[in-house]
Amino acid sequence: HAFVGSNIVEQPGELRKYDVSMGGTKWKPELPTAEKMNSLIEEYQNSLSTNATDTILTFMCKLMKMQAFNDGNKRTSMLVANHELIKKGKGILSIADEDRIEFGTRLIKYYENEESIEELKQFLYKKCLDGVNSNT
């Protein structure tokens, strides 16, 4: 986040220290902690051997939902996901302009209901992920 947010956001690379509201929902993320961030990273690293693509998308969605930083959470999460996807030869994630509203709607649904992550990931697989075999 420090790299992505440099000269763009306040306190790049630092965890958010205040409550925030999200547009389009009454849901509010908890304050992030170093322990929660480390736990998410550890969960990601421990799951990579099963299905790398699914693990990367899950990590991205959870990082977005965490809202760890003051700004740039979706940008940072997508850049990290694309870095990992490319590194593992699993394609690239890109949300087309015509899919942005549906993506936002599905993301908010996931924020409000943890179980909706599978619907969000299926949308990402079908409409936003190019050059990937979804079974690996």
Describe the function of each predicted region.
Residues 1-136:
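FIC/Doc superfamily catalytic core
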